[in-house]
Amino acid sequence: ATANVGLASDIIAFPGMDYCNLATSRSIPIAQGIAERMKELGTEREVGDLKIKISGCVNACGHHHVGHIGILGLDRAGAENYQITLGGDGTESAALGERTGPGFPAGEVVGTVERLIGAYLELRSDEGETFLKTYRRVGMQPFKAALYADLAGGGAPEL
């Protein structure tokens, strides 16, 4: 086993629909997909301290709202859809994450997180600047641009 405490693959994910009757989406497969992709990319140590938290419904048992990257699974017209929040912090500098905009279908979440991490690596001021510090310095807009670049017009939607 490889130690991953504090790395992108050290994800807190409430089990979601796999084990909870209140949940509206699955969290375990999303967490597994993200962890596997981060290991494939081999950038976990470069990324460093990153708290990814996933909840399977609005009850927020996975504490997505205080994840540096938070993922909230919802039911949208019978399909699992995942909202992304950024900038949450559960430490003494507590902050609730901000929604990035429209959610993503289950099959796009891993790529979404990968785009966020790629944006972070490009935006950070140096190797020692964490995801959360980078987010606080540059704000939401550059991350939204990375997430929603494929939409018409090439930019992020306004909320």
Where are these regions (language model features)?
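Small-residue-enriched alpha-helical segments and adjacent helix-cap loops
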Residues: 1-79
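A glycine-rich phosphate-binding loop feature that marks nucleotide/adenosyl-phosphate handling sites
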Residues: 7-17, 48-60, 128-144, 148-152, ...
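Hydrophobic alpha-helical scaffolding
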Residues: 20-28, 99-106, 133
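Generic alpha-helix signal with a bias toward terminal, lower-confidence helices
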Residues: 23-26, 64-66, 73, 81-83, ...
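Residues that form generic nucleotide/phosphate-binding pockets
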Residues: 37, 112, 119, 134, ...
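Surface-exposed helix-capping loop/turn segments at secondary-structure junctions
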Residues: 42-44, 121-128
